[in-house]
């Protein structure tokens, strides 16, 4: 099992300070999910803003994998908040499964971005 390498963690922190970049803030992320949970249509623009902000970690050196990993984290959390907001559990998990299966067909980061947009505009 991998353990977080303190030296690597320190180096990433150094690079973030030097480049004056940061991850988006937890409160920014939670605002988006709270809006999703309550069914607020403005969650769409909030999620799109976060996706396009560039304020996210680098999960992979490969841009396509990076976008796919980000999408999986988004759909995973969105599924939980949709359930908390009253969506049927099985429907939420099935929708998540289908989106992740669709993700397999994405060939470019822009394909992933389009799928993310489809996710945001899905309604019952």
Q: Whereabouts are the PLM-identified features?
A:
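Conserved small/polar residues in nucleotide/adenosyl-binding loops
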Residues: 121-124
